[in-house]
């Protein structure tokens, strides 16, 4: 388990604000059928490990509820789970390539969907208060079962939602300097691989000697 170094502790509040601001705009203001409230959690988890990611996700939802009186705290365990999975995928080197980063997002979304769907069905009566409620209502009209409707809504939205955010993380990481990324506990496992400079004729002559005719 990775320790929380100073840089990680400094990043966590920034990530929490990022989660809350984007999540509030997408789910509450725009009422889109997405969440997009985990980018900061994924960033911390991938760079600093499962513990830091889990704590960031958990605190994001608790603080969000304290600020806006939303239902976010009910899904705090889901947010923590996303951070833990991002940390595990980061530790295993999955987040250096776009293909496996996308797959990590889909797998995380499936796991999150099952947990979130059950929470929504049994604790909230199928209503989350966000932009996905319209989709839940559609499935409820089709199947007549709140549990089935909540699970189908989550399985429809979460894999896409987490795919978008993991891919966004992939490109975000590539916009940051490598010397900063490697200072995080898992930074070397997540940062883009270093590309060796091309060997020029001048370099060849300097290190090996002139070519023989």
Question: Which role fits each region the language model picked out?
Answer:
Residues 1-213:
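Loop-helix junctions at membrane interfaces
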């Amino acid at each position: 388990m990775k320790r929380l170094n100073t840089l990680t502790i400094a990043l966590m509040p920034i990530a929490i604000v990022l989660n809350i601001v984007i999540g509030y705009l997408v789910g509450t203001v725009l009422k889109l059928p997405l969440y997009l409230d985990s980018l900061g959690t994924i960033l911390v988890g991938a760079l600093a490990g499962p513990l830091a990611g889990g704590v960031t996700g958990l605190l994001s939802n608790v603080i969000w509820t304290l600020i806006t009186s939303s239902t976010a705290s009910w899904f705090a365990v889901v947010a923590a789970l996303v951070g833990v999975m991002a940390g595990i995928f980061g530790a295993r080197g999955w987040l250096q390539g776009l293909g496996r980063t996308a797959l990590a997002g889909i797998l995380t979304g499936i796991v999150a969907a099952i947990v979130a769907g059950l929470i929504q069905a049994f604790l909230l009566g199928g209503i989350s208060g966000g932009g996905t409620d319209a989709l839940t209502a559609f499935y409820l009209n089709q199947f007549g079962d709140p549990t089935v409707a909540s699970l189908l809504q989550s399985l429809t939205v979460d894999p896409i939602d987490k795919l978008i955010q993991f891919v966004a993380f992939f490109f975000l990481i590539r916009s940051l300097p490598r010397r900063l990324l490697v200072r995080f506990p898992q930074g070397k496992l997540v940062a883009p691989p270093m590309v060796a400079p091309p060997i020029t004729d001048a370099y060849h002559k300097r290190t090996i000697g002139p070519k023989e005719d």
